[in-house]
Curated annotation (Swiss-Prot):
Gene, per the UniProt record: SRY
Protein name: Sex-determining region Y protein
Family: Belongs to the SRY family.
Biased composition annotated in UniProt, kind: Polar residues: 174-187, 194-204
Record-linked InterPro entries: HMG_box_dom, HMG_box_dom_sf, SRY, SRY-related_HMG-box_TF-like
Cell compartments where the protein resides: Nucleus speckle; Cytoplasm; Nucleus
Post-translational modification remark: Acetylation of Lys-130 contributes to its nuclear localization and enhances its interaction with KPNB1. Deacetylated by HDAC3.
GO function term, MF aspect, one: DNA-binding transcription activator activity, RNA polymerase II-specific
Record has Acyltransferase as a keyword: no
First-listed, main subcellular location of the protein, grouped into a coarse class: nucleus
Organism in which the protein naturally occurs: Balaenoptera bonaerensis (Antarctic minke whale)
Pfam family, any one: HMG_box
SMART domains the UniProt entry points to: HMG (SM00398)
């Protein structure tokens, strides 16, 4: 069967709208077999979002802290969750081994049930996503300055790790130029004093 294609379907505006809609919708992988309607939806980012992640079995502290956390939260409604966790950790350390023993036994039972339910389970911790480094604005990343040394402009730039080297280099230039400037500034005074003494001798 042939389908009549409208010429407007290939206009630049329609093509741009279709490309944008394709980027927003989840990607669909179709099989090459034309008679099959099977498809696999991968999601917008390509990750397996439909599968539930298997949780680890609770340890003795988690078993004990479930009821204790609820109790502390009811007694102190204004207390933050982080403060509750610190308090529970301190209270757990203060318990004796005999007081902890029932919770270790319960955790062992839960671990056995988890092993029977998920025989091939392996704990894989989630890797923390690397945060992109914040880019400094152009004004702060590259600081250009100009200094006037012996009637000459020397531009220099502070950038990344070269700031210290550039600063020391400019300080060395300054220290080198100071005697010259001092000498040049003293020259008019010497000429003035010699001219004054010469004129005084002529008068006498």
């Amino acid at each position: 069967m042939f389908r009549i294609v409208n010429g407007e379907d290939y206009s630049p505006a329609v093509q741009q709208r279709n490309s944008l809609d394709f980027g927003k919708a989840p990607s669909l992988l179709w099989t090459d077999n034309g008679g099959s309607n099977d498809r696999c939806e991968t999601g917008g980012n390509g990750r397996e979002s439909g599968q539930d992640r298997v949780k680890r079995p609770m340890n003795a502290f988690i078993v004990w802290s479930r009821d204790q956390r609820r109790k502390v939260a009811l007694e102190n409604p204004q207390m933050q969750n982080s403060e509750i966790s610190k308090r529970l950790g301190y209270d757990w350390k203060m318990l004796t081994e005999a007081e902890k023993q029932p919770f270790f036994e319960e955790a062992q039972r839960l671990r056995a049930m988890h092993r029977d339910k998920y025989p091939g389970y392996k704990y894989r911790p989630r890797r923390k996503a690397k945060r992109p480094q914040k880019l400094l604005p152009a004004d702060s990343s590259v600081l250009c300055s100009r200094m006037h040394i012996e009637e000459t402009l020397y531009p220099f730039t502070y950038k990344d790790g070269c700031a210290k080297a550039t600063r020391s280099r400019m300080e060395s230039r300054l220290s080198y130029s100071q005697p010259t400037n001092t000498t040049s500034s003293l020259l008019p005074q010497e000429h003035r004093s010699s001219w004054t003494s010469l004129s005084h001798n002529r008068v006498t």
